[in-house]
Amino acid sequence: MRFLAFSLMTILSVDHALGADGLEPLRYNHPGLVVDLGVGLWAWPLPTDVDNDGDFDLIVSCPDKPSNGVWLFENATGDTRQNAMPVFKPARLLSKTQKYVMPSYVDGKMRTLSPGVEYKNFETKGIEERVTLPVDPNFHKPLGKQPKGPKVRHNQWRYVDYDGNQALDLVVAVEDWSYYGWDDAWDATGKWVNGPLHGWIYRLRNEGTTQTPKYAAPEFLQVGESRLEVFGCPSPNFEDFDGDGDLDLICGEFLDKFTYFENVGTRSKPRYAPGSRLLSMDGSELAMDLEMIVPVAFDWDRDGDFDLIVGDEDGRVAFVENTGFRSTKDPKIPVFAKPKYFQQQADTLKCGALATPFGFDWDGDGDMDLLSGNTAGYIEYFENLSGSGVEAPKWNRPERLEVDGKVFRIMAGPNGSIQGPAEAKWGYTTLCVADWDHDSLPDIVLNSILGRVVWLKNIGTRTAPKLAKPQPIDVEWNGESPRLAWGWERPKGKELLTQWRTTPYVHDFNGDGLLDLSMLDSEGYLAFFERAKIGDHSIVKHPRRAFLDESNRPLQLNSGAAGKSGRRKLCFVDWDRDGKLDLLLNSANADFFKQVDTMKGNWILKNAGTLAKKNIEGHDVSPTVVDFDGNGIPDFLGGAEDGRLYYMRNPLSLP
């Protein structure tokens, strides 16, 4: 187990301990390295030639925290006709941003909208110059009766001359959650009993002119006698995809696929056929790696047809090429190549979104590497190329860890998330590296969106780790295995099924030479799962709520239910070097729970406040500790919503 062992020093005062305020994202420090292009959480792409140099650049709006902004990636390679996969320069911030910023391409120029607003000079000013449109941005009134949830999320506005009368109309795509609700709507068999997500599209006919618009009342687009619909987040793209002179429609969705609606009417009187899934060249359904996709139709490779530039939830953006071929099932449906994710010159380390880093010398070469989970459900490995004793290491691009020769990934699937089928492509991996089976090789202990705690045994060597398939963490329960008070999942055998998206932390807490486990139990209390030896093998004992506050009450780190449960990221370390194990817990950065006493095998912890003043919290911040400079003092590293890893020296390391 990697646990920083620190000798006793003069006890640092809490005031001093909380005085440092760094929190700077780790940088690759690796000239010439190329990595996936990425903003923070949620990528809304706006391809255009920003600098009028004849090649296409990429603007990406990112409404997350702490990377909120309109970000410009300049094409440093050249004409996308010759090279459709340029290497972009690191992003430059144009402005802050709002949600749901989308481009419209009118007479060879880009016009940019968000709900109820158009932005002038967007390519250079971002959202600084606003013009209000004469339409209520919240005109859609949800009618579903589900009490939970946001009612409406995605609200996408675009210009299009829908009927070819030379006056730009408005199309507005809405994502209605009022029938879906939010969470905990599974029956005992794992069937979702609430409604689906609805992705609908309105047309607001312009009865005036493009220069002086007068918009009619919104009307839903139809397919026959029914509303045209996809599973949330339609991202509508009206272009002539089949070359017959009228405007067809390609939509995205909240999940990962695309739907094509052929215009079987005319340019002036559109009429849409039932939707068909877009296919890739091998005949499989065209799909992105993640979900919450945002496609924008754009002739990126300048070959005369419309490709798709698609943003993913984790901040990446992909080129999805229109091959020019047609489906063998229907010659009207265009066929696209599989997504290729754009690349950029390496700048700051990024592990998807909601990164959950852990510092450990994974390759056994004497320096501290990083492993991290993310929303997509991968475990990514960042190799330290500098050696020990370097505070700002040179990093390699991340590798996704494999099991049995295939990239390891946890996903919820159709019914694995307490928040419903809309979360099928998410995994929310959070991990700890430790020698769980005491064979002198580091293993991985893992929790995820599923709440089933597993470990991946290292069957390789110390310098060349290799992981076996996940195995459950079995517990010797006192009686029946505890179940969660929500959801349809039940523990299998002795396995540990607990609250989702919360860190398992492995350490020899009681000093008996066996590695124990601490994490949230099924009711949100921080529990101690002690290991014990039975013959020649070890067991995990029934948990105790052994971590107490100053009033000797067990620490309940989350009292929420269902989707509000779990979500706590934590790390144990002797942060203040007083010889006692402290707790770092996710907050605006991380709260420092100082160990002040022990009592009858319990640990008494006092919340001494956040480590830093700077707030980098979106969904949460996942804390770990590192010692890149090799001085024996643990420094802070926090994985944020934007997928970046924020570093701060321990105040004890400050000059």
Report the location of each language-model feature.
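Sec-dependent N-terminal signal peptides
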Residues: 3-13
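Beta-propeller-forming repeat regions
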Residues: 18-655
